[in-house]
Amino acid sequence: MLGPMIEIDKNGSELSPLELWIENILKGQKQFAVLVDPDKCTKEMVPKLMKYLPQQATHIFVGGSTVAPGKTHQLICAIKQHGALPVWIFPGDAEQISSEADALLFLSLISGNNPKYLIGQQTRAAAQLRTMDLHTISTAYLLIDGGAQSAVARVTGTQPLPAEDLEMILNRTMAAYHMGVKAIYLEA
C-alpha cells in the first residue's frame, strides 16, 4: 500500500499521490498547493484556515524552515480532521515527518553544496520512513536569487543560484533529472 490517498485508474490499477497529481495535470486540471508553516499556523487556527482556503486549492503542503518537533504532526492531524484535501509534507528537516500525511516531498537542496541538506537530513529521514506507510516524492529543491535572503538560505547556509545564470540552473535541474528526481521545486 502506498498511503491513504490512493485512487484507482481506468484499468483498475492503484495510483500513487504523484501519479494522480501528474494524471490531473495531463488532463488539463490545474494544481494549486497552499503552503502552511507550522510555526505560523497552530492547530487551533485550522478551522479558520480551512474556511478561508482558496477554492482553487488542490493540495496543502505543510512545513517550514525552522519548526519545533511535533508541531508538523499536530498541524497535519488538525488539517485532516477539518478538511479533505491531500496533505503533503514540505519539510525543512527530518523532524517534520508525520505518518498522518498523504505524501512527503523528499527534498534535496541541490542549489548549494551543504551536505546536511543534500543527503544528511535525507539519511535521518530514511530511518523514520522505514517504519511508516508514507509515499515519498523525490524532489530537487533549487534556491534562486530573488534579491533578498530567504529563510531557507539563512537556515541552510546555502547561497541561491544567480537568477541570470540559466545554464547553471538548467545543469542542476538536469543533474537531478538524471538522478531520478520526480519533481523540481524552484524558490526565489
List each language-model region with its residue ranges.
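N-terminal amphipathic alpha-helix/helix-capping segment at the start of soluble metabolic enzymes
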Residues: 2-36, 126-138, 145
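Alpha/beta enzyme core
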Residues: 31, 38-85, 91-188
